[in-house]
Regions:
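Extracellular glycan-recognition surfaces and repeat-rich motifs
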Residues: 344-376
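Extracellular carbohydrate-recognition regions
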Residues: 327-352
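Extracytoplasmic beta-rich repeat domains
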Residues: 1-22, 29-30, 47-62, 69-80, ...
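Secretory/extracellular carbohydrate-interaction modules
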Residues: 368-435
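Short, aromatic/His-centered strand-loop micro-motif at the edge of beta-sheets
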Residues: 432-454
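Short tryptophan-centered beta-strand motifs in secreted/extracellular beta-sheet-rich domains
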Residues: 340, 392-394, 449-459, 466-470
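Short, solvent-exposed beta-strand-to-loop segments that form ligand-recognition rims
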Residues: 469-495
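Short S/T/G/P-enriched beta-strand
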Residues: 230-274, 323-333
């Protein structure tokens, strides 16, 4: 909702609460700011610029005070790290006006604060636990709970339950001047002589404590205690003021739709007042744009053309001087083909400014260039996630600059076919972060040459067979698959797509 992104990967989790009768969503963000948004409409209420880097710590709200922390460079000094208390009643940029207190040089970059009975407990990146006076920020006491602080402290049964990255699990009894250690264990790997890394916090429920580690999931509780899952009690978020009768914001619901050619979709319009409070449903006038053959009735029912091709457009609802838009993607039955002669397909999902259609050798092709942010890997999805039992194919072309060569590939049902430039290999993989399945084969290939890629996934009983094929575009398609992988825990469906790592230009054409 605001500034330039400083980090592309942050982990702050937002919270919801009521401040001054207004329901807010409060969150740390990738631009180093804490934002308060109207929870139902997303309108920004205030922002507080805390760090020059992204925020990973989740904020805590108590009444009209927000507690937040980070471990990077502060915006107003070279000091690293800070814990702050923010007056949550402001509007606009409250950085200079609504800070209640700060605790300097506390590198609390991952672990989120815990508030209990007037004390704010924080764990810094070196696993030092601090108890702060929540009203003033003064340090009441501190103690070491290990060497690497990632997880957050948890309060239960009058005690602090703390995990530390190097396998340490502690139960502490806090007091006014310190904490007494009641128990300390080190979780171990079962088949290796080392500790099991722990990144998650304790979870409390059903008379048990749950903790996850590299070695497994542990449930801690009295032996023989019966387990009975039951709904929890919703927290009291505070009293929200009554809505007025004057709309200031409209929402079209559903806001985004994937439809098949010939489908009908019902839309409704919701109205909210200046405080982001729900007023009610509204009767609206409707228009439809960029959906060939589509029409929408006076009561908001969109009908797509039975013979519609793949496309994307919008429906707009107007009430008085207000309007709101819903996005619609329409997909025809297979087969599909795309040669980019009409530009970038509007129904494709993903990508960014480094993607464009341009002319090469008299043909329109899809170019993916280097990213301005330095994040050169992009995946672009072409259809609904419910698709299965299909084959995806494309012509691809990769450039070279010095020793730098890109990767280029296809996506089918959550499986990626990756033609790797610097490694000169073809890989089939799923879940790139962990490479849940991975098969590869040596495959020398040349830059500045068009190749054809083909990826097919077959669900066979309780497994999936993934087949990939590569050949020079000007040559005949080989009868044998270049690489095959078997997945015993298969992805049953997923969108087709194209993918590439492109510090230099790559091109796609004739995608089908």
């Amino acid at each position: 909702p605001g500034g330039t992104v400083a980090d592309m990967n942050t982990q702050s989790v937002g919270i919801v609460g009521v401040v001054n009768g207004q329901r807010l969503w409060i969150d740390g963000n990738a631009d180093g700011r804490i934002y308060a948004l109207k929870a139902r409409t997303g309108e920004k209420v205030w922002e507080f610029h805390l760090s020059k880097r992204g925020i990973n710590v989740s904020p805590v709200l108590d009444g009209d005070t927000v507690y937040a922390a980070h471990s990077e460079e502060n915006i107003d000094s070279g000091i690293m790290g800070r814990v702050v208390a923010i007056d949550a009643t402001g509007t606009g940029d409250v950085t200079a006006t609504h800070e209640r207190w700060r605790a300097e040089e506390m590198a609390v970059g991952f672990s989120s604060p815990l508030l209990h009975n007037g004390s704010l407990y924080v764990i810094d990146n070196s696993a030092n636990l601090f108890s702060l006076d929540a009203a003033t920020g003064a340090v009441q006491w501190d103690t070491s709970v290990g060497t690497v602080g990632k997880a957050s402290p948890v309060w239960a049964d009058g005690k602090l339950f703390i995990t530390e990255t190097n396998g340490n699990v502690r139960i502490l009894q806090p007091g006014p001047n310190g904490a007494t250690e009641l128990d300390h264990d080190e979780l171990q790997m079962r088949d290796e002589d080392r500790y099991a890394e722990v990144y998650g916090s304790f979870a409390v429920g059903y008379g048990r404590l749950y903790v996850t580690s590299e070695a497994g999931i542990y449930a801690i509780g009295a032996s023989g205690t019966p387990f009975a899952a039951r709904a929890g009690t919703a927290p009291d978020l505070g009293g929200e003021a009554a809505a007025t009768s004057t709309p200031t914001v409209l929402q079209v619901v559903p806001a985004e739709v994937i439809a098949s050619a010939g489908d009908s979709v019902e839309f409704e319009v919701r109205a909210y007042d200046a405080g982001g409070r729900f007023i009610g449903m509204q009767e609206a006038s409707w228009t439809v744009e960029d959906l060939a053959g589509g029409s929408i009735s006076a009561n908001g029912v969109l009908t797509t053309a039975a013979g519609a091709t793949n496309q994307a457009g919008t429906v707009t609802a107007t009430v008085g001087g207000l309007s709101a838009v819903g996005q619609v993607r329409v997909y025809a039955p297979l087969p599909w083909s795309e040669n980019f002669e009409n530009g970038r397909p509007p129904q494709w999902i993903g990508g960014g400014g480094s993607l464009a259609v341009e002319e090469v050798d008299g043909n329109q092709v899809f170019r993916k260039g280097a990213s301005r942010t330095g994040i050169h890997r992009h995946a672009i999805y072409m259809g609904p996630t419910s698709m299965s039992g299909y084959t995806v194919q494309a012509d691809v072309f990769a450039t070279q600059r010095g020793r730098r060569r890109p990767d280029i590939g296809l996506i089918n049902s959550g499986y990626t076919m990756d033609l790797q430039g610097n490694r000169q290999k073809l890989m089939i993989q799923s879940w790139a972060a962990e490479l849940r399945i991975q098969e590869e084969v040596e495959f020398p290939w040349e830059p500045n040459t068009w190749y054809t890629l083909k990826l097919r996934v077959d669900n066979e009983g309780d497994r999936a067979i993934v087949r990939a094929k590569v050949w020079p575009r000007d040559g005949a398609e080989p009868s044998d698959w270049t690489l095959t992988a078997e997945d015993p825990v298969p992805n049953r469906s997923g969108s087709p797509g194209i993918i590439g790592y492109s510090p230099i230009d790559i091109y796609f054409d004739n995608v089908s």
